[in-house]
């Protein structure tokens, strides 16, 4: 696998190796897979200085490419973020094993006993952009769920991802599992992405994690099934019955904690009655924190806001920018989100149970929240240890994609010489 100039041959070899590894992983004991993840976590921590040095090369590359501050933040690793990678690997290792779990079982009058049990999907292809931690998250979750994985990281994170991948291979080797269970495409050549999208003989599902351009290309060109992770155009609606203290706290966190993640709030909707009664001091708080608030005609009365343009609504800024407008009640908020949202994560701030129920019932985002920061839209925060992404489609996986979502199922039917009449 040394001739990287012949991309089709390279990818065919990777695919064949992954398929063979998947067949072995399907019956590998749970404790063996967990051992690999624990050993990988130890390797990541032991090599943290090397990873940070490799990341510095990636950051230089990103600066030369003119990456935005948000993209540079996604790319950056320090000791605290590496500790997060290690913690994620260990958390996934400690989870209950999804493979072989009995989802349901029943007896039929014919004498048959039927069980529905979880099984791995097979080989998963993950295509992602600048976040090197996805290398660890995706590798861990696929291994936990008994799947082989082919990782194609962004060119920006090439050096960081390569070192993290080496640690994952160390873990596989320590547990006596095939090192080809987790493979990283060893070239920045974009032709590798095109090959992955057509590898129907060896890849069972593709998961793209990145911006609209990447996801759109995958959806348009893939001949392999896709779990789509679309933009995080996350809304927060301040209802007439919102608690002022909770509102101020949640909005500031949802926008400013980390602007470059898909769970960052991008649009603020304010109930007209609330605004008439209370104003919107939380907008002043955002401005004081350095956020550019692009406001509609009504909210432009607040000093420091700037006029919103039509295309500011329905836009993922991934920056210290938020769009804001006044709406007429919860139904106005629902109508706006249906038009401009990406079905990722949307939040209502209210103390009114009936209004919250209406918001939950009439929107179909993958994640709906009440009185909580949209930055909780994360598999780790959901107790999954890690995530590959937030699936916004409606087929198979939806919301945070953890190990359980990377499985299918099969039926095990037992009889006793039973025949059909």
Swiss-Prot record:
One of its GO terms (molecular function) is glutamate-5-semialdehyde dehydrogenase activity. One of its GO terms (biological process) is L-proline biosynthetic process. It is found in: Cytoplasm. It is an enzyme of class 1 (oxidoreductase). Its EC number is 1.2.1.41. It holds the Pfam family Aldedh. GO terms for cellular component: cytoplasm. Transmembrane segments: none annotated. Gene3D superfamilies: Aldehyde Dehydrogenase, Chain A, domain 1, Aldehyde Dehydrogenase, Chain A, domain 2. Keywords: Amino-acid biosynthesis, Cytoplasm, NADP, Oxidoreductase, Proline biosynthesis. It catalyses: L-glutamate 5-semialdehyde + phosphate + NADP(+) = L-glutamyl 5-phosphate + NADPH + H(+). The keyword Cell membrane does not apply. Pathway: Amino-acid biosynthesis; L-proline biosynthesis; L-glutamate 5-semialdehyde from L-glutamate: step 2/2. Belongs to the gamma-glutamyl phosphate reductase family. Catalyzes the NADPH-dependent reduction of L-glutamate 5-phosphate into L-glutamate 5-semialdehyde and phosphate. The product spontaneously undergoes cyclization to form 1-pyrroline-5-carboxylate. This is Gamma-glutamyl phosphate reductase. It comes from Dinoroseobacter shibae (strain DSM 16493 / NCIMB 14021 / DFL 12).
């Amino acid at each position: 696998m040394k001739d990287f100039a012949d991309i089709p041959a390279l990818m065919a070899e990777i695919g064949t190796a992954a398929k063979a590894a998947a067949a072995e992983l399907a019956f590998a004991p749970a404790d063996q897979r967990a051992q690999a993840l624990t050993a990988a976590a130890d390797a990541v921590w032991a090599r943290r200085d090397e990873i940070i040095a490799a990341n510095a090369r990636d950051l230089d590359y990103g600066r030369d490419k003119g990456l935005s501050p948000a993209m540079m933040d996604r790319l950056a690793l320090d000791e605290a973020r590496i500790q997060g990678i290690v913690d994620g690997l260990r958390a996934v290792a400690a989870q209950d094993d999804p493979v072989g779990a009995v989802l349901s079982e029943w007896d039929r009058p014919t004498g048959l006993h039927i069980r529905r049990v979880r099984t791995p999907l097979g080989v998963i292809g993950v295509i992602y952009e600048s976040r090197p931690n996805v290398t660890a998250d995706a590798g861990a979750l696929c291994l936990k769920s008994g799947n082989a994985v082919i990782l194609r990281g962004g060119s920006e994170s090439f050096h960081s991802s390569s070192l993290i991948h080496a640690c994952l291979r160390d873990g596989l080797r320590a547990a006596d599992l095939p090192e080809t269970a987790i493979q990283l495409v060893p070239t920045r050549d974009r032709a590798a992405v095109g090959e992955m999208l057509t590898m129907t003989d060896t890849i069972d599902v593709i998961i793209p994690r990145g911006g609209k351009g990447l996801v759109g290309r995958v959806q348009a060109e893939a001949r392999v099934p896709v779990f789509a992770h679309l933009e995080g155009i996350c809304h927060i609606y301040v209802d007439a019955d919102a608690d002022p203290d909770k509102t101020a706290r949640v909005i500031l966190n949802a926008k400013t904690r980390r602007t470059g993640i898909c769970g960052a709030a991008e649009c603020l909707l304010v109930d007209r009655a609330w605004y008439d009664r209370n104003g919107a001091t939380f907008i002043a708080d955002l401005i004081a924190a350095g956020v550019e608030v692009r406001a509609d005609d009504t909210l432009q009365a607040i000093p420091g806001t700037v006029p919103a343009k039509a295309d500011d609504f329905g836009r993922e800024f991934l920056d210290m920018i938020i769009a804001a407008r006044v709406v007429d009640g919860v139904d106005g908020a629902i109508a706006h989100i249906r038009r401009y949202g990406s079905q990722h994560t949307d939040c209502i701030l209210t103390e009114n149970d009936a209004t919250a129920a209406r918001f939950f019932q009439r929107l179909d985002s993958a994640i709906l929240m009440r009185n909580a920061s949209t930055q909780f839209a994360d598999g780790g925060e959901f107790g999954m240890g890690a995530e590959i992404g937030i699936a916004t489609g409606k087929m198979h996986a939806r919301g945070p994609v953890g190990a359980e979502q990377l499985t299918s199922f099969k039926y095990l039917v037992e009889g006793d010489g039973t025949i059909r009449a």
